[in-house]
Amino acid sequence: MKERLPHEKGFHVSWDQIHRDSRALAWRLDGQGPDNGAWRAVVGITRGGLVPAMIVSRELDIRTVDTISVKSYNWQEQQPPSVIKAPQAELMGDGHGILIVDDLVDSGKTLELVRTLYPRAHFATVYAKPSGRPMVDTYITEVSQDTWIFFPWDMALQYVEPYRGRD
């Protein structure tokens, strides 16, 4: 059987879809924080987690927002993850009361690294693949491991020439 290219089994996510799914994630997390249901802060894993983190923080009215930047890909090649930018140490502690948000858990290597730094944080993603699912506490949609997710911030709308020639 011929191996598929990443785009051949693709899941295209629109801006509207990521917004709806991120709101659904917020609703699922509402009242689940350790401090009488509240979360102390939202930390987005850059870059993909920024949009979902912003939407979750807005929906849950969490005003303290920070980021952690983890590099685990060089173009489309996966590499060992490394932290490029960490959130404020005094905010994070061991992660208690912190909601860490990303767009997707794929292999789980990024979340595994972040979880070693903040073991008591709550990890939430919009989408989850089976290999990474054990690393996430809350997610909205599961997709198969061999599906490539196309996020709207990775895509560009462009003009396409009509099949029968020019306008």
From Swiss-Prot:
Binding site for GMP: Q79, D106, S107, G108, K109, T110, W148, I149
UniProt pathway: Purine metabolism; GMP biosynthesis via salvage pathway; GMP from guanine: step 1/1; Purine metabolism; XMP biosynthesis via salvage pathway; XMP from xanthine: step 1/1
Membrane topology of this protein: Peripheral membrane protein
SUPFAM superfamilies recorded: PRTase-like (SSF53271)
Superkingdom of this protein's organism: Bacteria
Family annotation (Pfam families): Pribosyltran
Residues where xanthine binds: D106, I149
Subunit structure and binding partners: Homotetramer.
Cofactor(s), by name: Mg(2+)
Protein name: Xanthine-guanine phosphoribosyltransferase
